[in-house]
Amino acid sequence: MAPIIRKSHPLLKIINNSLIDLPSPSNISAWWNFGSLLGICLITQILTGLLLAMHYTADTSLAFSSIAHICRNVQYGWLIRNLHANGASFFFICIYFHIGRGFYYGSYLYKETWNTGIILLLTLMATAFVGYVLPWGQMSFWGATVITNLFSAIPYIGQTLVEWAWGGFSVDNPTLTRFFALHFLLPFLIAGITLIHLTFLHESGSNNPLGIISHCDKIPFHPYFSLKDILGFTLMLIPLLTLTFFSPNLLGDPENFTPANPLVTPPHIKPEWYFLFAYAILRSIPNKLGGVLALAASVLILFLTPLLHKSKQRSMAFRPFSQVLFWLLVANLLILTWVGSQPVEHPFIAIGQMASFTYFLILLVLFPMIGALENKMIY
């Protein structure tokens, strides 16, 4: 019998073992679709970004007008630009759902996979931040100024570090040029880390909603989950295209239609919606260094979740108290997102401080406590 080429060819067998003959748990739900959706988002962003980079000019005097040129004069430039901008939002929607699913079903106990995933999140956040600066509108400029300035809170080397990042004494042409270079580079770094992420995942195999070992009941990835993923792509691309065609600027900031002006500060400086929860945590602490540490902790706290798992059960499927706490955390994050978009005044300051405190309380104290309590109740 002749060898099957997909199983014998050195390159094809890697694809075969990852996407065709991969043994997968038979009961994984739609929550397991977001990994492949993130892959589609990344490919879409790289392709649209490449096309945009062909027409974009990374110079302070030309950047804003080059975006206008793309939207007006380039064939389907408006579509490519809006797909790229809104694709970023969908990227973050998918990654937040993906992390939430990992948190709910205890996937973080695959420590290497989880840790590479957090590194991916941090790289994605960096990519989105430097990308937001490129149109060189008011919010781009002031967002870059405010966020890069946070590094000056680092004792002793802070100010030097900021000026080194800027390439001068303020956000100017060198800053824009290097941000464009970074924005081009980082997505390929994300693609590389994604391969490491998948390598670690395929060492252990996927988790499943019950959080139990599923070696005895595996099914091939193709055709079952390949088809399910295609359905997922369709269900994501429909809202993305709807947003892009009918309301492309819905998630953007009106300030960014004004070219960057270092002499005029916008009334409310705020990042894109997907960073608002972290921005609210940053603002809730009246001390600069404290705020920066809280901002860093809000994401880096994810590294601690495997260490804070005290339950004898992996998944939350049969842990009602932990479920309630999980949805409280989700509601808390939504409140933080809303507060981050509001001006710094009463009552938003107090709400932000309470929500920030609750965020860390739930993750660091209540989850381990409830996990231990459920052990006492069940076992």
UniProtKB/Swiss-Prot annotation:
Matching entries from InterPro entries are given as: Cyt_b/b6_C, Cyt_b/b6_C_sf, Cyt_b/b6_N, Cytb/b6-like_sf, Cytochrome_b, Cytochrome_b_C_euk/bac, Cytochrome_b_N_euk/bac, Di-haem_cyt_TM
Q: Which domain of life is it from?
A: Eukaryota
Q: Which GO terms describe its cellular component?
A: mitochondrial inner membrane; respiratory chain complex III
The cofactor note reads: Binds 2 heme b groups non-covalently.
User: GO terms for molecular function, please?
Assistant: metal ion binding; ubiquinol-cytochrome-c reductase activity
Protein task: Component of the ubiquinol-cytochrome c reductase complex (complex III or cytochrome b-c1 complex) that is part of the mitochondrial respiratory chain. The b-c1 complex mediates electron transfer from ubiquinol to cytochrome c. Contributes to the generation of a proton gradient across the mitochondrial membrane that is then used for ATP synthesis.
Q: Which PANTHER family match?
A: CYTOCHROME B
Protein name according to UniProt: Cytochrome b
Gene coding for it: MT-CYB
